[in-house]
């Protein structure tokens, strides 16, 4: 990739903000680009302690790279203590931690990662504990994976109900989800050295207009931007253009009054299957900026952070009709690590490439529409969500793209 002056300036602005945060919070030291926190007490390192042989070696190898710390349960006091411990150790190392807040009520629509706060009040208190734990120390906060992609009793822009429709709840559940996210953004954005990102789903999921409307309603204006591809597998050539389109769509809607349903997408005028056709969507955005007499300004628009922990081989496409529900996001076979985590993306729309999903940790049982308990694609009973899956860790390392220099 050839970097323009604007690209370089954009990266310098992002890094300067993090450097400033570190300088304010830490003793004086020589200025250098900040790095992401490599936690010696990560869940990957903990998994290595319980393993032996090749599985242990794989976990120790993966533990050398920075990955996110997931905060997904516990009382406000517990999450406060956990967050304080992580950000304090990161600050001492002059590194930037990535914290995943994953405790919103009715999380994951009661699927493999079910759980979360009991209600909106409990969630507000939990976020308050997280904020107290972070304090004035630098951190990147990934606020609620699937928080905007899977909303109970939510209607799309075309008025259709989505699939998450739990019994005993109604359309008020969707309004509560937005209230909870806006409340969390308000609390966390008051912290001086935190970069907050909201759920932006991915190019294999929602059209840019659909997710842009949700991000705007969730107060992305007060956040740094949105995260993409978390716990997913979309390749760089798909997810990076999508980041640009979501950012542009937000700008067109908020600055130009565009109806988000008019935002071009990976489905139109482009063809989803053919990424070569995606230049048609780029051109459509150019025309919209011209029509509304707006100047595209990536440096002032909302930016993405992208999860590259498992996207080296792209998404999995099983034969059509093989499974009643293929669950292509759930421990798919033959995937690989993607590009290494970095705060220097070289892209005007992307703040960082991160390993948000911890590579090597299971997505869940992955029954693919069967009665289980065996994953029919792998012919094994997969570990519960978040537990170490040694066979998958081995695949990710072997099939890494770009290839890893050494193991």
Regions found by a protein language model. Give the residues of each.
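Substrate-binding cleft of extracellular glycoside hydrolase catalytic domains
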Residues: 88-196, 210-222
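A solvent-exposed, charged loop/short amphipathic helix patch at secondary-structure junctions
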Residues: 156-172, 367-390
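Surface-exposed substrate-engagement region within the catalytic domains
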Residues: 46-58, 206-372
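N-terminal secretory signal peptides that target proteins for export/translocation
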Residues: 1-10
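Structural recognition of the beta-strand scaffold that forms the well-ordered cores
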Residues: 35-38, 69-72, 96-101, 138-144, ...
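Boundary at the C-terminal end of the N-terminal hydrophobic targeting segment
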Residues: 25-33
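N-terminal carbohydrate-binding/catalytic regions of secreted carbohydrate-active enzymes
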Residues: 33-133, 357-384, 400-401
